Design a protein with these regions (language model features):
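Amide-donor transfer/coupling interface in amidating biosynthetic enzymes
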Residues: 2, 12-15, 48-143
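Cysteine-nucleophile active-site neighborhood
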Residues: 1-63
Length: 143
């Protein structure tokens, strides 16, 4: 975030009118604030980024692996079937909120994707999610 602010990109990004896609850390930077480094972020999404806190011995952080996503409510997921898997690798998450466009569950439910106006974001990595991720990226390019 410091580099974005130092170069003026923080203001430029918020003013963009074309579709914008943030992936993983990109989604987190689009939120209001992050527990990682106690950083104020872009504030595109009125949401906080929180660190996963394991509840059981088998809960590992970072969360790395394949999860299904549900409640897909965005043009990114056009043609998306239920129970398709996408790949995650992250230690921080965004709680479900008014901008949530898809959810998943690891330790507890969280936002797998966000959408507001021309801004789209995924916590998972579509570029690592095989044909499902390819479809999501194609849907974004078709916006």
């Amino acid at each position: 975030m410091e580099h974005l602010k130092a170069t003026g990109l923080d203001k430029l990004i918020k003013d963009l009118k074309q579709p914008v896609l943030g992936i993983c850390l990109g989604m987190q930077l689009m939120c209001k604030h992050s527990e990682e480094g106690n950083a104020d972020c872009l504030g595109i999404f009125d949401a906080e980024v929180k660190r996963f806190v394991p509840k059981r011995h088998e809960d590992k952080v970072p969360h790395m692996g394949w999860n299904t996503i549900t409640n897909t409510n965005s043009a990114l997921f056009t043609g998306f079937d239920k129970d398709e898997f996408v790949y995650f690798v992250h230690s921080y998450y965004v709680p479900v909120n008014e901008h949530t466009a898809a959810t998943t569950d690891y330790i507890h439910p969280f936002s797998a994707a966000l959408h507001k106006d021309n801004f789209y974001a995924t916590q998972f990595h579509p570029e690592k999610s095989g044909s499902v991720g390819e479809r999501i990226l194609k849907n974004f390019l078709d916006l």
